[in-house]
Curated annotation (Swiss-Prot):
Required for rescue of stalled ribosomes mediated by trans-translation. Binds to transfer-messenger RNA (tmRNA), required for stable association of tmRNA with ribosomes. tmRNA and SmpB together mimic tRNA shape, replacing the anticodon stem-loop with SmpB. tmRNA is encoded by the ssrA gene; the 2 termini fold to resemble tRNA(Ala) and it encodes a 'tag peptide', a short internal open reading frame. During trans-translation Ala-aminoacylated tmRNA acts like a tRNA, entering the A-site of stalled ribosomes, displacing the stalled mRNA. Coiled coil: none annotated. It comes from Rubrobacter xylanophilus (strain DSM 9941 / JCM 11954 / NBRC 16129 / PRD-1). Belongs to the SmpB family. GO terms for molecular function: RNA binding. Keywords: Cytoplasm, RNA-binding. GO terms for biological process: trans-translation. InterPro entries: SmpB, SsrA-bd_prot, SsrA-bd_prot_CS. This is SsrA-binding protein. GO terms for cellular component: cytosol. The gene is smpB.
């Protein structure tokens, strides 16, 4: 099965250093909404607070069939990780230019999992260099394809 939500902008704006798989504490209506694909990770990030890890700023639209349950779309959601992973993430997030970002929400054995990454923000010239590299690679592939046709 495919992902429920992806943070495609993160791959463009950040250099990914290491990734972790985390469980996410959701309410029942939130799980149903996520399974419908109504989650957005674009402006979200991960914060370590008091030895616990939270997903901040993720938007999960309210499930329309759950009327009697109050639903807050952008509340902070607790992430479920092992203590060693939490300590490692806390240390990494204290380093200069490092941040923890969500990459994707996906199903695993009937549960909703979140892939998070320790990343550093790309500078503008890094983005330009990457675009130039992709363009050059595309030109090479196009030339090779044209060469093979002859």
């Amino acid at each position: 099965m495919s992902d429920f939500a992806r943070n495609r902008k993160a791959l463009h704006d950040f250099d990914i250093e290491e990734t972790y798989e985390a469980g996410i504490a959701l309410t029942g209506p939130e799980v149903k909404s996520v399974r419908e694909g109504r989650a957005n990770l674009r402006e979200s990030y991960v914060r370590v607070r008091n030895g616990e890890v939270f997903l901040v700023g993720a938007h999960i639209s309210p499930y329309k069939n759950a009327t009697n349950v109050p639903q807050e779309p952008t509340r902070d959601r607790k992430l479920l990780l092992h203590r060693k992973e939490i300590d490692r993430l806390a240390g990494k997030s204290q380093e200069e230019r490092k941040t923890i970002i969500p990459l994707r929400l996906y199903p695993k054995n009937g549960l909703v999992k979140l892939e998070i990454a320790v990343a550093s923000r790309k500078r503008q010239y890094d983005k330009r260099r990457e675009i130039a590299k992709k363009t050059a690679q595309r030109e090479i592939e196009r030339a090779m394809k044209e060469r093979l046709r002859r």
